[in-house]
């Protein structure tokens, strides 16, 4: 997101939305139906973790428009299946035009799946959600400039995930994950989706 001096902006249907959520039809649907809504389940959180890592250095719309390609390429982000991917699968992924073909990000995804496959069922969900800050301590942002890129909680989550062996999850990526999965509600105070998580 970029800084902006205004609040929510009316969309095509007249409902006020965060300004970033109006730049493309894909963004409108993502903003309205997904971003900031609670995501639970190890595989669902693994998908979001992977997509946020692939987004690093790119625009989110690039990832959003390739999400189905990612889901197909990475076996629906089912941790147990991705953990069994071989070197041949890595080569296949590097040739797949439906995803971002970045060797470091692909390798990190496969390594993270192998590591997470060893965790007890539900552990990733519990672990990530244990870093959700108390909503009462976070005022609703009025403008996009009020929305941070990194917080103490995202820095702590990033460090904790790295300590447990996960790769490609810095504090900014961790905060984007927290926003996308509803750990924090960064919809603007006058956005219709505020509090829908």
Model-derived features: positions:
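HhH-family (HhH-GPD) DNA N-glycosylase catalytic core used in base-excision repair
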Residues: 1-197
């Amino acid at each position: 997101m970029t800084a902006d001096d205004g609040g929510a902006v009316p969309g095509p249907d007249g409902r006020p939305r965060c300004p970033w959520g109006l730049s493309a039809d894909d963004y409108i649907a993502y903003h309205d139906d997904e971003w900031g809504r609670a995501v639970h389940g190890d595989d669902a959180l693994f998908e979001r973790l992977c997509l946020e890592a692939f987004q690093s250095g790119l625009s989110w719309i690039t990832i959003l428009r390739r999400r189905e390609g990612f889901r197909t390429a990475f076996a629906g982000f089912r941790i147990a299946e991705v953990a069994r991917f071989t070197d041949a699968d890595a080569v296949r992924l590097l040739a797949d035009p439906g995803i971002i073909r970045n060797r470091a990000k692909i390798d990190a995804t496969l390594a993270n799946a192998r590591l997470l496959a060893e965790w007890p069922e539900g552990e990733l969900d519990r672990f990530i959600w244990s870093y959700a800050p108390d909503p009462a301590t976070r005022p609703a942002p009025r403008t996009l400039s009020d929305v941070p890129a990194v917080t103490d909680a995202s820095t702590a989550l990033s460090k904790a995930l790295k300590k447990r062996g996960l790769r490609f999850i810095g504090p900014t990526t961790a905060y984007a994950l927290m926003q996308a999965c509803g750990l924090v509600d960064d919809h603007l105070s006058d956005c219709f989706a505020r509090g829908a998580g």
